[in-house]
A protein has these predicted regions:
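Membrane-integral, polyisoprenol-dependent glycosyltransferases
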Residues: 1-232
Length: 232
């Protein structure tokens, strides 16, 4: 039953998202602003510190643009469809990840209902159909929270730190700060001492910085003080 409902949810996600992403042109200034960075990566070959259409350094970390550029390289060019694909895939991953999380704790029926409600939420669905970093950031944060909860039950949060590192590479330190703060409050509510909760989350946060630090170091080596000014 669980596998059947998982497949149903996956099919609904694919059918309601993937066929429609390229039907409209870019309709906000934010969409082409992200797509042009991926276009710049492909044209210049600079995937570390790309520039936007005006020649300025892109002010967001590059994971979202890497995904667009990779998909567009396969397709042959940057299009509305390839530019929106990372957001759609992030939404699908978030919904299916949520299904697996809730199916284990509340049953497959509740998990399926959760997935359908999430997918049909207007703002979530809109973000999953746009070429913006927000859906990918949200997906990584939500998946990190699922893993942190799982690690509160048992285990070490290695996967959570990977998700938070990817979230930071999508839109900056909020990808680490937000899930750590939420989990810290959760631990306090559960009766964990303040210092234990604080140092546990501090260790998780520091570990999560390793992956994005690799890009920040490479970007600084290439951009120097201009990159520091942009980040600060």
């Amino acid at each position: 039953m669980k596998n059947k409902q998982f497949i149903i949810l996956a099919v609904v996600c694919v059918v309601t998202l993937l066929p429609f992403m390229g039907l409209t042109d870019f309709h906000t200034k934010g969409e082409p602003r992200e797509a042009i960075v991926a276009y710049s990566m492909i044209e210049t070959g600079n995937w570390t510190l790309p520039v936007n259409n005006g020649g300025d350094i892109a002010y967001k970390p590059p994971l979202f643009h890497w995904c667009i550029a990779a998909l567009s390289s396969i397709a042959g060019k940057v299009t509305e469809y390839t530019s929106r694909m990372p957001s759609a895939l992030a939404l699908i991953a978030m919904v299916l990840g949520g299904f697996l999380f809730y199916a284990k704790r509340r049953g497959a029926s509740v998990a399926l209902l959760m997935g359908l409600i999430t997918l049909s939420n207007f703002e979530v669905h809109r973000a999953g159909m746009n070429c913006r970093v927000d859906m990918m950031l949200t997906a990584f944060i939500v998946l990190a929270l699922y893993q942190l909860y799982r690690c509160c039950e048992k285990g070490v949060p290695w996967i959570a730190t990977l998700f938070m590192g990817c979230a930071t590479l999508t839109k900056g330190p909020v990808g680490i700060l937000l899930p750590c703060m939420v989990t810290g409050v959760f631990l306090l509510i559960r009766g964990t001492s303040f210092f234990k909760a604080f140092f546990s989350m501090a260790l998780v946060a520091i570990t999560s910085c390793i992956l994005p630090a690799l890009w920040y170091i490479a970007a600084y080596q290439q951009g120097g003080d201009n990159f520091i000014s942009l980040v600060m």
